[in-house]
Regions:
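Non-catalytic alpha/beta scaffold blocks inside enzyme catalytic domains
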Residues: 335, 339-620, 671, 675-680
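N-terminal export/assembly segments and adjacent metallocofactor-ligating motifs
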Residues: 1-16, 24, 36, 51-55, ...
């Protein structure tokens, strides 16, 4: 530890820390443009100049290491004059675009010019102008505003792992851009907008829409993948206008995937805003009593074993426990939440959660990916794996379809046969201090999925990934609702049917709770389908009765991420038209048939959640534990010999919100369609 004095305050920081970090530890605010806590140090903006005793001139605090006994001054006349000079140089070529710039009101350059700049300009020469660059459908460029901080270059190379941005030329001719003019091929490109300190990189789909001070901010949880990234939903009136990441070191740090950030325009398209009932083969608008009456009329003649329910990928825990209680009251054990057919058992949590936790990735000594492409399934988690590799040696092996993960990985095979023949990588896995195995949904689909899960667990035991201090067995989900549903036991009860068993006439009444990710053509022609959800998607097209529900931004909901971390979102906007929160719809229907569910408000529903599974009583907290019980999950059928499939064939089209989004459709045309054409 190094001891130094900052503006008369004694500070102790680790050896190797920068002077800027020491100043922050002393509570001093140091202006900066190029420095970012999660990127390498560039030291090229010079805005963070401070005075160090016995130094001949001001030094850049972000790039200067501390030394024992150092005396630092952050607010002397020399420092103020130096910062004023730097700001004057930065503004020489910067246009006066503040009144029309989308960054206005949240611009670092604006704020620091006010605090450290001059009240007039002495520059009377011509300003330079730079041609705007094309970076794809999500990031808009105004390169004349660029101050060459190089944050975007470092983010692309270090965090996203796609080194497509760089600087060309030198001096006043220097420009930032892509070496070849094409769209950025990263699922994290929206983060460039957040880290840009000026208005050079902006939100293209939402440009010139609103000022930041006009927006109402609501904390929430993302549902577009299973990581549960913490987000801020910014709305005005009844419309969501943007979604930004919230910092959570244990989940998403401060990053957010492009789908989570930009798909919100799908929240206002193809919405279900009133009940519908199919009459003579055609869906007709109806009232709530008429819709409930149509369902009740069908229920009267049915025994419990002819009723089934399927929960979708975006459901909150409150609606799932209400539907489970409703079906139980009707005498049915036909439940399923695994639309993709993944062989995941409910019960012991270690068999279906990411046990090492997301921060635990940084402690892994070696990583084996089985049937998963984390770049497509969870880009922010993939960035965490890349971060681990940037910290030091960590061999990575993959079993499944070959893919560019943005980091070096040994491809060991395409299917389950490779689990028994890891070769040299197996030796690396056994030699690693804390080996990690990540199993994806593509490996668990199909009749051999249970055997793959059991084999992966046995492999974890064999390589030493399961110890009292470390649990290196992890399941990476693709659905935000999946872990919560398994925690609630939303799977077939004794004698119950799974999704496959409910298809083809296996039940006479099927309740789809926002379930759109399976082939509805498999449903029996005579099966009466109730679809409860928020978008007119696949499930609604097959429905006999449609009950309009609320999207994730329109209700307070509890979600459990792939780690098993319980998180909660809050209401940002109101549902459109006659749509209502899903648990309330189920409660109202139960009352209409004389079997009222035992809760009247959201607090009572959450008490019921904690009663069903105590994990719902605790939010955010997640204790990482080792594994003391080495007995594995049931093996089921034998493993197949075919290759694993792909869990997410199109990153931008994974749920009804994305499929309704014009922005996501443009991304598919830009990124996915050319790849599919090339493959053909």
């Amino acid at each position: 530890m190094a001891k130094l004095i900052v503006d008369g305050i004694d500070v102790e920081v680790p050896n190797g820390a920068s002077v800027l970090q020491a100043c922050e530890a002393a509570g001093k605010e140091i202006p900066r443009f190029c420095y970012h806590e999660r990127l390498s140090v560039a030291g090229n903006c010079r805005m963070c100049l401070v005075e160090i005793e016995k130094a001949p001139k001001p030094v850049a605090s972000c790039a200067y290491p501390v030394a024992d006994g150092m005396v630092v001054k952050t607010d002397t006349a020399m420092v103020r004059q130096a910062r004023r000079g730097v700001m004057e140089f930065l503004l020489i070529n910067h246009p006066l675009d503040c009144p029309i710039c989308d960054q206005g009101g949240q611009c670092d350059l604006q704020d620091q010019a006010y605090s450290y700049g001059m009240d007039h300009s002495r520059y009377a020469e011509n300003k330079r102008a730079v041609k705007d660059k094309y970076l794809g459908p999500l990031v808009k460029t105004f390169m004349t505003r660029c101050i060459h901080c190089t944050r975007c270059i470092r983010f692309s190379s270090e965090v996203a792992g796609v080194p497509e941005m760089g600087a060309v030329a030198r001096g006043e001719n220097m420009e930032i851009g892509t070496y070849i003019e094409k769209a950025l091929t990263t699922e994290l490109s929206g983060n460039l907008i957040d880290i840009c300190p000026v208005g050079a990189l902006l939100d293209k789909p939402n440009s010139f829409v609103a000022r930041p001070w006009e927006l109402r901010k609501t904390v929430s949880v993302d549902v577009h993948d299973a990581l549960g990234s913490n987000i801020s939903v910014d709305g005005r009136g009844s419309e969501v206008l943007r979604i930004l990441p919230r910092t959570n070191e244990d989940v998403n740090e401060e990053w957010l995937g492009d789908k989570s950030r930009f798909a919100h325009d799908g929240l206002k398209r193809r919405r279900l805003d009133k009940p519908w009932v199919r009459v003579n083969g055609k869906l007709q608008p109806a009232t709530w009593p008429e819709a409930f009456g149509a369902i009740a009329a069908r229920l009267r003649s049915l025994p419990g074993d002819r009723i089934g329910a399927i929960a979708g990928d975006l459901c909150d825990a409150e609606s799932m426990v209400a539907l489970k209680d409703l079906t139980a009251g009707l005498g049915s054990a036909n439940l399923d939440c695994r639309q993709d057919g993944a062989a995941l058992p409910a019960g012991r949590r270690e068999f279906y959660t990411f046990n090492s936790t997301v921060p635990g990735i940084e402690e892994a000594g070696a990583i084996l990916l089985i049937g998963t492409n984390p770049r497509r399934e969870s880009p922010v988690l993939n960035a965490r794996i890349r971060k681990r590799l940037n910290m030091g040696p960590c061999p990575v092996g993959t079993i499944g379809q070959p893919a560019d993960l943005t980091y070096r990985a040994d491809h060991l095979g395409n299917g389950p046969a490779a689990l028994g023949n890891l070769g040299v990588f197996g030796d690396k896995l056994r030699a690693a201090k804390q080996p990690m195995i990540i199993v994806g949904q593509a490996a668990l689909r199909g009749p051999g999925g249970a055997a793959v899960l059991a084999a992966a667990w046995a492999l974890a035991v064999e390589v030493g990934a399961l110890t009292p201090e470390w649990n290196g067995f992890n399941v990476l989900h693709t659905a935000a609702a999946r872990v919560g549903a398994l925690d609630l036991g939303f799977v077939p009860g004794p004698g119950g049917k799974d999704l496959q068993g409910m298809m083809g006439g296996g039940v006479d009444l099927l309740w789809l709770l926002a379930a759109d990710e399976f082939d509805t053509a498999r449903i029996g022609a005579d099966t009466f389908v109730v679809y409860q959800g928020h978008h007119g998607d696949r499930g609604a097209a097959r429905a006999d009765v449609i009950l309009p529900g609320a999207a994730y931004t329109e209700k307070g909901g509890t979600y459990v991420n792939t780690e098993g971390r319980v998180q909660r979102g809050f209401v940002a906007t109101q549902p459109p038209g006659e749509a209502r929160e899903d648990w309330a719809i189920l409660r109202a229907f139960s009352a209409s048939i004389g079997q009222s569910l035992p809760y009247d408000d959201i607090g009572a529903v959450r008490d019921r959640l904690a009663q069903v599974n105590p994990v719902f009583a605790h939010q955010q907290g997640l204790d990482r534990r080792g594994c003391t019980d080495l007995s594995g999950p049931p093996a089921g059928d034998t493993m197949g010999d075919g290759p694993f499939g792909v869990a997410v064939p199109d990153y931008y089209q994974t749920n009804p919100i994305c499929r309704a989004s014009a922005t996501m459709a443009e991304c598919t045309r830009t990124y996915t369609a050319p790849l599919q054409l090339a493959a053909e």
